[in-house]
Amino acid sequence: MRESPAPSPTLPTQVDVLVVGGGPAGLSAATVLARSRRSVVVVDAGEPRNAAADGVHAFLGHDGLPPGELLARGRQELATYGGRVVAGTAVDAVAPEGADRVTVTCADGSRWSARHLVVTSGAVDALPDVPGLAEQWGRAVVHCPYCHGWEVRDQRVVVLATSPAAMHQAGLFSQLTDAVTVVVHDPQALSVDDRDRLQALGIEVVQGPVSRLVTSAGRLTGVEVPHGILDADAVVVASFVEATSPVLTAVGLEPADLEMTGRVVARSVPADAVGRTTVPRVWAAGNVTDPMAQVVMAAAAGTRTGAMVNAEMVMEDQARRLAG
């Protein structure tokens, strides 16, 4: 399904709910709202976090589906209930205290007025500056054993230790293959006790740093370390995950640090269990609030937030009618 053009006379700028971000969380939230007979529009910049991946995994009924196909199906389902997707980038928002609407401005100058705003703009993965790493990201370079682990089973896996998450990753991937090697790229990533523990578990620890990934005909074959080249079929690395949303920043919601053993490993926007933020009428769901959430978790979060937004509007409407 093709995305709708920017706002026109047939697409009113006033809607019940505006969703910023057309990934699994955003489309799920919008579909719940559309099925509740709410006018809902999704503004999508077209930059899904998992675009580089070959397929989506650990999502019941959708295993192996290319990310783009999953989103295309989601847009089609949303359209069935009258919801719309428009291409655009939301860059500003105003949510005045006590007001009954939130106003969002897009990069093309279009403006939307909504009773509630749901931000599901996801997060960005910042990778270590190692030549070849970004080019293989989502294919031979992975981070999640539940998203990509089965695909690298029994292969030679190198864990690039750049943060405390490497210890966790090494253990999880050792369940999938006996050929796990940890390369200490950042000396602060692992403690002496961590290294001793890995070696006691039979996981080889090699001193880095990694200077580059080695490929042949576009396929990963190894990583270069100070003493030579380690053969590798896959590299595991923990990206620094950061929620970025100018819309949330504009209304006063700044990302908060997430720490692991005293080191900041991600930043996300605080929200409660149903996606409610501290700013009235502004909600958030998916990776923007939970950087580690897989696709199915992000979709579930969007569904839950969409349901809560609808319930909130029902109560608002009832209160208005009772007030006469």
Give, region by region, the residue ranges found by the protein language model.
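FAD-site-proximal beta/loop scaffold in flavoenzymes
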Residues: 135-151, 241-296
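FAD-binding core/adjacent interface of flavoenzyme oxidoreductases
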Residues: 1-17, 85-155, 222, 234, ...
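N-terminal glycine-rich dinucleotide-binding loop that anchors FAD/FMN and/or NAD(P) in oxidoreductases
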Residues: 35, 39, 45-47, 54-80, ...
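Active-site glycine-rich loop that binds ribose-phosphate moieties when present
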Residues: 139-146, 156-169, 190-192
